Regions:
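Membrane-interfacial, low-structure loops and terminal tails that flank and connect transmembrane helices
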Residues: 37-56
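Membrane-interface helix-loop-helix modules in multi-pass inner-membrane proteins
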Residues: 36, 65-111
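Aromatic-anchored segments of alpha-helical transmembrane domains
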Residues: 65-72, 132-141
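Alpha-helical transmembrane segments of polytopic membrane proteins
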Residues: 10-24, 57-59, 94-108, 156-158
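Short, strongly hydrophobic alpha-helical membrane anchors
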Residues: 1-13, 82-85, 89, 145
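Cytoplasmic-side transmembrane-helix entry/capping segments in multi-pass membrane proteins
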Residues: 54-63, 121-133
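Central hydrophobic cores of alpha-helical transmembrane segments in multi-pass inner-membrane proteins
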Residues: 20-39, 101-116
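Transmembrane helix-loop junctions at the membrane interface of multipass transporters and ion channels
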Residues: 140-156
């Protein structure tokens, strides 16, 4: 049966491909920056306990984003069969916390945490991780038709 309001369309999948390609470029730059600055971290003893350049995980994450972007570019033919979308269990979890009382309480707790941890949040790597989490979460949320309709309303777009 034809769904009049599909969660994914070819245009949405293709557009998200550009988002993930942009994220790839940003994180590839971050990996190069980390390599040039010479940042390292020590693995836990259970994994060998050796120093690893921090550019390594960033480069792997950037390659993962490139693969996700390529999947979006080449798989836009059958939107109903596309696998990279907001999981139903996560959508249900968000809906549980979206009622007014939980939303207010969670927003207040997060606001207090942001103020309390403000010195940690402004460190470059912490801010970069937060930006990545936000953009990937937005990319997944855009795969939901209802969310797309809410954020695309003229009163929500500058």
């Amino acid at each position: 049966m034809l769904d009049p309001h599909p969660d994914l369309t070819s245009g949405v999948i293709h557009g998200l491909g550009y988002l993930y390609a942009l994220l790839f470029c940003m994180n590839a730059y971050w990996a190069v920056r980390s390599f040039k600055l010479g940042y390292h971290f020590r693995l836990p003893k259970s994994l060998g306990g050796q120093d690893v350049p921090s550019a390594g995980p960033w480069a792997m994450y950037a390659v993962l984003l490139l693969l996700v972007a390529l999947a979006h570019f080449v798989s836009a033919g059958r939107p109903d069969a596309f696998l990279i979308r907001l999981p139903g269990w996560l959508q249900d979890l968000v809906n549980v916390f979206a009622d007014p009382i939980s939303y207010f309480a969670l927003s207040t707790v997060l606001f207090v945490a942001m103020i309390w941890l403000r010195e940690w949040w402004v460190k470059p790597t912490a801010a970069w991780v937060l930006l990545n989490i936000t953009l990937v979460s937005m990319g997944l949320a855009i795969t939901d038709y209802d969310f797309r309709q809410i954020v695309g309303k003229p009163d929500n777009v500058p």
